[in-house]
Amino acid sequence: MTYIAYRTKEKIVIDGKLNENAWLQAPKSPRFVDIVNGGPVLYDTRAAVLWDDVYLYIGFWVEEPFVRADITERDGLIFTENDVEVFIDGGDTYYELEVNALNTIYEVFFIWKDAYKRGGKYDVPEFDVHERDAYTFAGNHD
């Protein structure tokens, strides 16, 4: 699926309400599908993406009658609850942002291991997997 992000000149207030004219006119994505089998899901979920000179805006319409969220700690494992997730592909990296119904944020930046080479653009101390605070995806030291 391809979705086009549309430029907006209207001011958008970040308040969780998608009632500005820009959102009302923005084309919504097709209905989301099951991540495992690609089939239809029980409840409708769609998104729209807008941008201006400063921000990228992503709005979700989620038809979920039984929303559950308990985690309030930033970067807690909110993907175990109801949340929305955004992945931005950077080629050999990706940025992930998740937000649950309590506005708890899970944010991470991944660099594929094959992209990390000595002398390459990611050969910086912050990304050294042998540093004390560097963790692999599973949370264990490499």
Residue ranges and their predicted role:
Residues 1-142:
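Structural preference for beta-rich elements and adjacent junctions enriched in aromatics
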